[in-house]
């Protein structure tokens, strides 16, 4: 089986995440995409929504796609959510499967600053939602060259929205329709998140 892994704070999950996951799934013929909300993200600000709220929003957003599955493994683990630990756990559970880590261009740009990036690439290939490698550091360009058989660039139609923009719109009382699935919008409103 070919499994995609999309980690993130998902604060909140939005159509950009879903579109990237679906586009990568189709393009690379992935059987499943696991959405993995972080508990304590090492490279981002602390999420505003609780772990439970973010998990439930991801569940709601992915419910209609049988190829999408939400795994709470980082939420259940103590401490900072390092992807190397998640990949290690998944590779032991899915030892005969191919793992593909899905990363946006911004996350990939900082990949060498992550905890044990070489352990990650040893166990999983990487699919980068990107337009090319022109703006990467020389270290990252060398890394790409050394692992060119495990790093793939996916030129996909970019969905120009951010979770930060969505949170700001909610706080200002503006619509988030067409930015998040309706079920997620309803959940945010019902629970008064981001106000």
Curated annotation (Swiss-Prot):
Pathway: Cofactor biosynthesis; NAD(+) biosynthesis; deamido-NAD(+) from nicotinate D-ribonucleotide: step 1/1. SUPFAM superfamilies: Nucleotidylyl transferase. Disulfide bonds: none annotated. It comes from the Bacteria. The keyword DNA repair does not apply. It holds the Pfam family CTP_transf_like. InterPro entries: Cyt_trans-like (IPR004821), NadD/NMNAT (IPR005248), Rossmann-like_a/b/a_fold (IPR014729). Belongs to the NadD family. Catalyzes the reversible adenylation of nicotinate mononucleotide (NaMN) to nicotinic acid adenine dinucleotide (NaAD). This is Probable nicotinate-nucleotide adenylyltransferase. The lineage of its organism: Bacteria, Pseudomonadati, Dictyoglomota, Dictyoglomia, Dictyoglomales. The gene is nadD.
């Amino acid at each position: 089986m070919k499994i995609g892994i999309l980690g993130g704070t998902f604060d909140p999950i939005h159509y950009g995440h879903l579109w990237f996951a679906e586009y990568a799934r189709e393009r690379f013929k992935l059987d499943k995409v696991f959405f993995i909300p972080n508990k304590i993200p090492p490279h981002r600000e602390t999420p505003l929504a609780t772990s439970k709220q973010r998990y439930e929003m991801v569940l709601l957003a992915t419910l209609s796609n049988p190829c999408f599955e939400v795994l709470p493994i980082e939420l259940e683990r103590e401490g900072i959510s390092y992807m190397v630990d998640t990949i290690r756990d998944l590779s032991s559970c899915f030892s005969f499967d191919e793992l593909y880590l899905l990363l946006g261009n911004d996350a990939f740009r900082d990949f060498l600053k992550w905890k044990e990036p070489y352990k990650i690439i040893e166990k999983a290939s990487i699919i980068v939602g990107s337009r090319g490698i022109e703006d990467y550091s020389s270290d990252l360009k060398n890394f790409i060259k050394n692992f060119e058989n495990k790093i793939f660039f996916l030129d996909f139609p970019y969905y120009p929205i951010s979770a930060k923009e969505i949170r700001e719109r909610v706080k200002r009382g503006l619509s988030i329709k067409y930015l998040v699935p309706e079920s997620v919008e309803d959940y945010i409103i019902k629970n008064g998140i981001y106000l």
